[in-house]
């Protein structure tokens, strides 16, 4: 009985002061939760907005990445090494596979481009996936391609099919050659020639306006690089960078076991890039 009376008095004595303390604690907790929600929401929205403007991770052959780092060459420089196209779907088997929004393999090649309106010699064109169905090592399937990674392009017409002799042409190149939707453009290399139907003319606002995009298989055949690619663009949903992710990006080996596990199991761009390198032999993945 005495114990119950003691407890009762401890709660009822100075009730006003205790109520004020409880109210203050509750208010502080509410403010902290609200601020945390705002911070996380802003980071997620910023990341989602940035991913609408193309890839945020680029995968290259290790040899090309080394040369690029040593001599600060442009990403558009002619490739000196290649990746196996059949290994690229492994990107969707990494720990953060569900954060991979889209990806596309590409292969650049120098070709002669001609049409009824003129011709251009030694033009660098890009072969890629547009909307390609892929079989994964897990037995699942996925669709990948640049159609969702070029959302800022203005397209007059439609995207090509991956299994057809078709292409989309940049607005500047289309103007030089007098091309429009439905016209035919011919790509020629020492390996042979390939007439392609123009399905659309796009405006990108950058150097892509001076070139064209064709199905990956077409450029592989014309350049003699069957089954090979020189770059993979990856669009991934990532967690905003912090000191841990920046430290890991320099060298994951310097992390402690606890930090390494935290970094690997968080969707930082650097950890996703690291996992892509684990999945694809001979590849280097970098955040862009």
Features from the language model and the residues they span:
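C-terminal or late-domain output modules
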Residues: 4, 30, 36, 137-146, ...
């Amino acid at each position: 009985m005495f114990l119950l009376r003691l407890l009762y008095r401890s709660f009822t004595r100075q009730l006003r002061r205790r109520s004020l303390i409880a109210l203050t604690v509750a208010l502080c907790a509410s403010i902290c939760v609200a601020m945390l929600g705002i911070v996380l929401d802003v980071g997620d929205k910023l990341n989602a907005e940035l991913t609408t403007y193309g890839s945020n991770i680029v995968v290259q052959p290790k040899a090309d990445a080394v040369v690029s780092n040593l001599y600060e060459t442009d990403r558009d420089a002619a490739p000196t090494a290649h990746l196996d196209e059949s290994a690229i779907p492994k990107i969707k088997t990494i720990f953060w596979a569900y954060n991979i929004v889209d990806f596309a393999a590409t292969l650049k090649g120098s070709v002669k481009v001609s049409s009824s309106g003129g011709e251009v010699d030694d033009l660098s064109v890009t072969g890629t996936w547009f909307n390609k169905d892929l079989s994964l090592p897990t037995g699942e399937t996925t669709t990948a391609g640049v159609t969702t990674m070029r959302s800022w392009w203005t397209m007059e017409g439609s995207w090509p099919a991956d299994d057809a002799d078709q292409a989309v042409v940049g607005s500047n190149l289309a103007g030089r050659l007098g091309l429009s939707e439905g016209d035919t453009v011919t790509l020629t290399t020492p390996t042979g020639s390939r007439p392609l139907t123009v399905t659309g003319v796009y405006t990108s606002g950058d150097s892509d306006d001076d070139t064209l995009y064709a199905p990956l298989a077409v450029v592989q055949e014309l350049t003699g690089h069957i089954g090979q690619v020189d770059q993979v663009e990856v669009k991934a949903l990532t967690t905003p960078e912090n000191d841990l992710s920046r430290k890991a990006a320099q060298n994951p080996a310097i992390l402690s076991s606890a930090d390494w596990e935290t970094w690997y199991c968080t969707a930082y761009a650097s950890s996703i890039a690291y996992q892509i390198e684990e999945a694809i032999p001979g590849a280097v993945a970098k955040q862009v």
